[in-house]
Design a protein with these regions (language model features):
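Helix-to-loop junction immediately C-terminal to a conserved catalytic motif
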Residues: 48
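The feature captures the beta-strand-to-loop junction immediately N-terminal to the Walker
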Residues: 33-35
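Conserved ABC ATPase signature
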Residues: 108-109, 134-138, 142
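Catalytic Walker B motif of ABC-type/P-loop ATPase nucleotide-binding domains
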Residues: 159-163
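Conserved ABC transporter NBD signature motif
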Residues: 55-65, 72
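ABC ATPase nucleotide-binding domains
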Residues: 226, 230-250
Length: 250
């Protein structure tokens, strides 16, 4: 579904991404993990078209820059960290409703179906208690729950998520991953994660990054064993067993 070929990116003299290549198959749930500053979010920004890819990122075999943005947005939903910039007099449902924008007819209001989808998604993702509340009175975690619901409101084929669990408590963190698991039954997920236990438990493929490079990729059980992760993050670890495999839980 997504293919990246020889993707490089630099700002001034600094190389951010260094000749990255990989493929994500349709129906997979792929995590991107690595130390802070290794380029995970930048990589996701290229896939989501927030940054130019110069014929290095392909969706269903076609370079993404040649796909009309509105058409791309109908199939690819994005949840990014920078989304916390949502401000103003907006209410919770307004944020989630924005996920239906690619389907809205020009100069027309959102349809009754759009509003029904918003309520359904807010219920399914646990965001319904926020319905009717103004954004300016919400915490970072509450805003994150809305941005997650907004992404699901697009009903995408491909879901791109940049550290969606960071501001969530344990209850909502696990609820999100279970919802992603259900979505994964009919869609494709690429997710940046710092929580290795969640990566091991829920993702079937992993891409490991360090200093702008991909140093390993493949089935999660093969690339996320405790010894490898300990060397990557340079921290003590302990073993835990998940489906008869050893992983680094931290």
């Amino acid at each position: 579904m997504i293919t990246v070929e020889n993707l490089s990116y630099q700002i001034g003299e600094k190389e951010i991404l260094k000749n990255l290549s990989f493929s994500v198959e349709e129906g997979s749930m792929t995590c991107i993990v690595g130390p802070n500053g290794c380029g995970k979010s930048t990589l996701l920004s290229h896939i989501s078209r927030r940054l130019p890819s110069r014929n290095s990122v392909f969706y269903k075999g076609k370079a993404v820059e040649y796909i009309p943005r509105r058409e791309y947005a109908k199939e690819v939903a994005v949840m990014v960290q920078q989304g916390f910039g949502i401000v103003g007099e907006l209410k919770a449902e307004d944020v989630v409703l924005a996920g239906r924008y690619p389907f809205k007819k020009r100069f027309a209001d959102y349809s009754a179906e759009d509003h029904e989808i918003v309520e359904k998604v807010m219920e399914e993702t646990g965001a319904m208690p926020l319905y009717g509340r103004e954004i300016k009175h919400m915490s970072g975690g509450e805003k994150q729950r809305l941005l997650i619901a907004k992404a699901f409101a697009q009903n995408p084929e491909l879901l791109l998520m940049d550290e969606p669990t960071n501001h969530l408590d344990v209850k909502y963190k696990l609820a999100l991953m279970e919802h992603l698991k259900r979505f994964h039954a009919h869609g494709t997920v690429i997710i940046v994660l710092h929580d290795l236990s969640l990566a091991a438990r829920y993702c079937d493929h992993a891409i490991i990054m360090k200093a702008g490079e991909i140093i390993d990729q493949g089935l999660t059980e093969n690339v996320l064993p405790a010894e490898k992760m300990s060397r990557l993050f340079e921290v003590p670890f302990y073993h835990a067993v998940h489906e008869e495999k050893r992983f680094l839980y931290c």
